[in-house]
């Protein structure tokens, strides 16, 4: 029976269908201009860019020129790349321009679609960012699509790892900039650690189109990008605690795989306390006494390292290092590290060198970074399942773009076996069958361990020609994926490895030409061989089509339906036939964690024998319900964490905006004076209670405060003893003395030097206090959840206390800046040999898995002093060479920075 809603959808179409139909008028208008555009010369077509810019300057909006601009890009793409955007691609481009997410199936040309709104919005002259998930895709897309922009008179830049500040600044200054999400976020953080506006590389956040938007804005949504500096070495402590865990019994701890948590039982805690006591690490009687907070953190990490993290699934050991495996893609991520000491615990477990921990200097999540853009849009093949999250958090609507040709892929019901062994036996038989008929196969696994297990099983069964695509071999992944459509090819891939590269039936002729003819010079021979390769690929394509197209066989379901849909979507591109099927067992992670006992009982009642499978739509629906529960839980976690992160984000925006104002201001003297006056107000109010008699005033305390903050030795005790003295009199005398001392110092220094000194001191002190503030908020966040036991809302408590900490930061800033500036004196030092400083590191932590992704900051502007030197406190610097980089972190030589004065 058809529901009323279903009947209405059939009669009127879905809301998505109606929205898509609404673009038809503009598509027709673009098509109507096609002949006119074709008639233009190359020069006349390129001149349209200047014409559009003049129209915008005269008051036209981007919407007003959308139709002719899209028509120009379509014609340019045809001339430059030989690609003409289809009508559905024009619709995708309009969706992106209108701040929405375009869901486009694999092979529908998302990269080309982006050129339409990118060109249109770049006409505004504010820069457009196209965001990809890795350097390879950023360079590939910028190289290919940049030809269109260049033909039309626009510049294209690309940001990848390892560029200098100057190269980054040039790339951001281009009309169009291709970059990875990591590089964009790190550049933003680095910019807000610079001490001069001219050192910054980004020029604003106008419009960003995020490719694979679900991966970046959902999978890594709450991933903090972190820039940090090293802390003291604690490797001995990690190694000592690591030895305790193997001495525990299973009843000494509780493991919850669903929540990814591990806790000690009462017996386990008692055993652990005895071990710690013997090692001299326990203070007091109980592990959970306040003085043992750090030790609790270490033992919990050690327990997780041994019981929650599995080698070759969560990480591998390579060249004496722990290398993280991405949960979603199965890729190795060199440089990514687990946070909060977890990585060090794993290093201790695997007996490799323990790298030092780091202190956070600056951080931001992708959620908050991308919400800074005036205009945001995204593309992906799978977004509909996360439409609620995109709408609630980013204000982005998800619209499905129709395929250019109907999808012919057949998605079969899952086959469920009782054990993993039975499942893999059936998979081997299915691979044999498909291989014999010449059907190309993509076999999806969820981990390196399982991909290599399957590879070993295939070898034992006599298979020699197959490709394994996982984290260990990611360097070759683009080529392997591109050739996975060759008849009879067997490609084993972890999750979405190779995402961004299409699997073309018969293989990818362009990649074959690039690889096979790399040494052949242009000419008749190369043209002949290129033609032969293309003809061979066409023959192979016909064979693959005859065999049924690409067969996607998945060996397990992921927690997210979206990841499963991504895998299915590799087959059936551009109207090709295809097939997809999932092989499952009750021992799979998803089935085991989310209640396979009931299903196992049901299968036994049905009399299911060994090696037999059950195939029924009910199974698919039950699994989908389990996945929906996981997705809803993960969404709630992300949504809740965002509420907490918004508190830090609001404060971060205030601090970063204040830094820019300080760098832009011609003079900060008024700011310094205001700070000094507020400090005077605070110390007077503290020592002279309101409406109190003079004998109740704390004259000695006030004298000490004035000495501490203003570096002035004033006869305050004598002033207080004067007949009829008032509080205002005391305040005015202190203010006058402080103003005079500041004026005398400014006269000695000269206005130019004084301006530089004042600005430098404020920025350095602000940065130092902000770093401490981040640590304080982290500590507050880690314990605030316990307020719920007292019937108090943890979020409201966090907001309230975070605000108090922020107010304290501002108060400390006023006091520290005032105290330092009132002590500044000019000095001259003899030159010494320069000493190099250790670089800072950039980190990328994934809260879903606890991963910490870092890369060397890569420029001297980000050098930090050794831990014995406090950048905000010159008294800790000791002897500094004139030619050494200044310990304050400005990036200048000491003789051009703090070398002109001394605190």
Swiss-Prot record:
Zn(2+) binds at residues 886, 888, 897-898. One of its GO terms (cellular component) is cytosol. Pfam families: P-loop_SecA, SEC-C, SecA_DEAD, SecA_PP_bind, SecA_SW. One of its GO terms (molecular function) is protein-exporting ATPase activity. May bind 1 zinc ion per subunit. It is an enzyme of class 7 (translocase). The keyword Oxidoreductase does not apply. It catalyses: ATP + H2O + cellular proteinSide 1 = ADP + phosphate + cellular proteinSide 2. Coiled coil: none annotated. Its EC number is 7.4.2.8. Its cofactor is Zn(2+). Part of the Sec protein translocase complex. Interacts with the SecYEG preprotein conducting channel. Has a central role in coupling the hydrolysis of ATP to the transfer of proteins into and across the cell membrane, serving both as a receptor for the preprotein-SecB complex and as an ATP-driven molecular motor driving the stepwise translocation of polypeptide chains across the membrane. This is Protein translocase subunit SecA.
């Amino acid at each position: 029976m058809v529901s009323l809603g279903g009947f209405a959808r059939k009669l009127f179409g879905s809301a998505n269908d109606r929205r898509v139909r609404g673009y038809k008028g503009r598509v027709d208008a673009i098509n109507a201009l096609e002949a006119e555009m074709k008639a233009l010369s190359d020069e006349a077509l390129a001149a349209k860019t200047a014409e559009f810019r003049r129209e915008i300057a005269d008051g036209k909006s981007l919407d007003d020129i959308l139709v002719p601009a899209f028509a120009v890009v379509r014609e340019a793409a045809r001339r430059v790349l030989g690609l003409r955007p289809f009508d559905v691609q024009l619709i995708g481009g309009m969706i992106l321009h209108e701040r929405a997410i375009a869901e486009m199936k694999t092979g529908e040309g998302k990269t080309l679609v982006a050129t339409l709104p990118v060109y249109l919005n770049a006409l505004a002259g504010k820069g457009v960012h196209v965001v990809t998930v890795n350097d390879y895709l950023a360079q590939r897309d910028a190289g290919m699509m940049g030809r269109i922009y260049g033909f039309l008179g626009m510049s294209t830049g690309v940001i990848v790892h390892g560029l200098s500040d100057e190269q980054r600044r040039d790339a951001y200054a281009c009309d169009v900039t291709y970059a990875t999400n990591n590089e964009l976020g790190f550049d933003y953080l680095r910019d807000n650690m610079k001490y001069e506006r001219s050192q910054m590389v980004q020029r604003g956040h106008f419009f960003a189109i995020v490719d694979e938007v679900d991966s970046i804005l959902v999978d890594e949504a709450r991933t903090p990008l972190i820039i940090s500096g090293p802390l003291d070495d604690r490797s001995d402590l990690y190694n000592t605690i690591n030895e305790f865990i193997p001495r525990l019994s299973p009843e000494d701890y509780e493991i919850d795989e669903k929540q990814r948590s591990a806790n000690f039982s009462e017996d386990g805690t008692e055993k652990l306390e005895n071990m710690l006591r013997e090692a001299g690490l326990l203070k007091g009687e109980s592990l959970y006494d306040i003085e043992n907070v750090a030790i609790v953190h270490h033992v919990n990490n050690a327990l997780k390292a041994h019981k929650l993290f599995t080698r070759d699934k969560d990480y591998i050991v390579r060249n004496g290092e722990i290398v993280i495996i991405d949960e979603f893609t199965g890729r190795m991520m060199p440089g990514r590290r687990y946070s909060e000491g977890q990585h060090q615990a794993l290093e201790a477990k695997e007996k490799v060198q323990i790298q030092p921990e780091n202190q956070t200097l600056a951080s931001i999540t992708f959620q908050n970074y991308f919400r800074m853009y005036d205009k945001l849009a995204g593309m992906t093949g799978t977004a509909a399942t996360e439409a609620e999250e995109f709408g609630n958090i980013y204000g982005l609507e998800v619209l499905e773009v129709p395929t250019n040709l109907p999808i012919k892929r057949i998605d079969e019901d899952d086959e469920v076996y009782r054990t993993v062994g039975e499942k893999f036996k059936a998979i081997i038989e299915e691979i044999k069958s498909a291989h014999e008929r010449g059907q190309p196969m993509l076999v999806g696994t969820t981990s390196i361990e399982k991909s290599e297990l399957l590879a070993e099983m295939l070898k034992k069964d006599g298979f020699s020609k197959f490709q394994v695509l996982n984290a260990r071999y990611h360097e070759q992944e683009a080529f392997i994926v591109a050739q996975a459509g060759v008849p009879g090819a067997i490609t084993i891939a972890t999750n979405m490895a190779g995402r961004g590269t299409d699997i073309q039936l018969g293989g990818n002729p362009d990649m074959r030409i690039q690889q096979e003819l790399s040494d052949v010079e242009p000419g008749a021979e190369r043209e002949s061989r290129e033609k032969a390769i293309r003809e061979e690929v066409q023959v192979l394509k016909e064979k693959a089509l005859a065999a049924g197209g690409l067969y996607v066989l998945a060996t397990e379901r992921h927690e997210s339906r979206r990841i499963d849909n991504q895998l299915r979507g590799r087959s059936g591109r551009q109207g090709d036939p295809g097939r997809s099927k999932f092989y499952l067992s009750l021992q799979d992670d998803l089935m085991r964690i989310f209640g396979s006992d009931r299903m196992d009982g049901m299968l036994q009642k049905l009399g299911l024998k060994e090696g037999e499978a059950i195939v029924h739509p009910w199974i698919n629906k039950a699994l989908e319900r389990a996945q929906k529960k996981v997705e809803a839980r993960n969404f709630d976690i992300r949504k809740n964490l965002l509420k907490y992160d918004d508190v830090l984000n609001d404060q971060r925006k205030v601090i970063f905006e204040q830094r820019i104002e300080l760098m832009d201001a011609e003079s900060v003297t008024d700011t310094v004076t205001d700070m000094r006056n507020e400090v005077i107000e605070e110390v007077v109010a503290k020592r002279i209670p309101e409406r109190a008699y003079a004998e109740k005033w704390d004259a000695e305390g006030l004298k000490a405060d004035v000495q501490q903050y203003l570096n002035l030795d004033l006869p305050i005790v004598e002033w207080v003893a004067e007949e009829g003295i008032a509080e205002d009199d005391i305040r005015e005398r202190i203010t006058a003395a402080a103003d005079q001392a500041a004026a005398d110092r400014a006269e000695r220094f000269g206005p130019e030097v004084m301006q530089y000194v004042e600005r430098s001191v404020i920025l350095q002190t602000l940065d130092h206090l902000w770093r401490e503030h981040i640590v304080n908020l982290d500590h507050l966040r880690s314990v605030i959840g316990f307020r719920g036991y007292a019937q108090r809302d943890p979020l409201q408590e966090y907001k309230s206390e975070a605000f108090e900490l922020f107010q304290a930061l501002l108060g400390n800033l006023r006091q520290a800046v005032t105290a330092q500036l009132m002590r500044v004196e000019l000095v001259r030092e003899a030159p010494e040999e320069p000493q190099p400083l250790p670089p800072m590191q950039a980190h990328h932590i994934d809260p879903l898995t606890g991963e910490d992704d870092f890369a060397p900051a890569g420029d001297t502007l980000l050098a930090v002093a050794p831990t014995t030197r406090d950048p905000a406190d010159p008294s800790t610097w000791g002897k500094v060479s004139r030619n050494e980089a200044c310990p304050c972190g400005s990036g200048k030589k000491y003789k051009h920075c703090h070398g002109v004065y001394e605190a």
